[in-house]
């Protein structure tokens, strides 16, 4: 979400985040959860922003417990990793909104232009050498963003990809093709590990690594 100095707010679609070992693995937008939960999350974030008289982009993360209740996990008073999907999939990105809010400009439109899955690229991919980006970029629905970091370390966020598709199922299929799902060969040169599944409404995946 983003809040202006005059109290006006704009909300991006609720994001479904999947983590591995405490690091964001991928985000699914729109989230695959009940609309009632999404409305509750927006109301809670709005109350927090108003109480703090906050100006700018604010990310509020929640857990959903076994009873279906929302529990606030953390707040990030800045553009956030889980908002990187907005660069390609929304009318205005979270970075546009940060500038607009801080400069007193009207807040931009947050409308989602396409369903999208954002996946982090971790330093594990650089274990042996620079990844073969030409293999990854064979997918026309995919947009690659690298951060220009010189040193790659396991778990360090080196970039991300946004996969846009007519629906989430198709976007996840591209993600599965990149990772290899254990039922077909992995993409040559990328070394994405097999997908694993956990309890919840969507898949959870192992950390990325470069193939041997």
Predicted features and spans:
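Peripheral (often C-terminal) accessory segments that flank ATP-dependent C-N-forming ligase machineries
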Residues: 100-212
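Generic beta-structure capping elements
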Residues: 14-17, 75-78, 147
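Short, acidic Gly/Pro/Ser/Thr-rich loop/turn segments
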Residues: 7-10, 19-21, 80, 126, ...
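Short, flexible active-site loops
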Residues: 22-32, 74-87
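Active-site "cap" helix and flanking loop/linker of ATP-utilizing ligase/carboxylase catalytic domains
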Residues: 39-60, 66, 76-125, 130
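Internal nucleotide-binding/catalytic subdomain
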Residues: 1-60, 64-66
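A general structural signal for well-ordered alpha-helical segments in protein cores
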Residues: 11, 42, 95, 155-158
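Conserved protein kinase catalytic/activation segment
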Residues: 68-70
């Amino acid at each position: 979400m983003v809040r202006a100095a005059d109290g006006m707010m704009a909300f991006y679609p609720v994001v479904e985040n999947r983590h591995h070992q405490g690091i964001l693995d991928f985000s699914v937008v729109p989230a695959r959860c009940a609309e009632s939960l999404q409305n509750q999350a927006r109301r809670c974030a709005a109350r927090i922003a108003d109480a703090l008289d906050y100006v700018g982009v604010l990310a509020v993360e929640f857990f959903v417990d076994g009873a279906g209740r929302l529990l606030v996990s953390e707040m990030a008073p800045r553009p956030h990793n889980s908002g990187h999907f907005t660069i390609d999939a929304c009318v205005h990105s979270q970075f546009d909104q940060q500038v607009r809010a801080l400069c007193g400009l009207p807040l931009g439109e947050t409308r989602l232009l396409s369903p999208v899955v954002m996946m982090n690229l971790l330093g594990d991919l650089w274990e042996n050498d620079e990844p073969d980006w030409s293999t990854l970029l064979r997918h026309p629905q995919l947009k690659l963003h690298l951060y220009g970091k010189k040193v790659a370390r396991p778990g360090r966020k080196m970039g991300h990809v946004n996969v846009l598709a007519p629906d989430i199922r198709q976007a996840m299929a591209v993600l599965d093709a990149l990772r290899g799902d254990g039922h077909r060969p992995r993409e040559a040169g990328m070394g994405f590990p097999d997908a694993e599944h956990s309890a919840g409404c969507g898949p959870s995946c192992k950390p990325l690594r470069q193939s041997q």
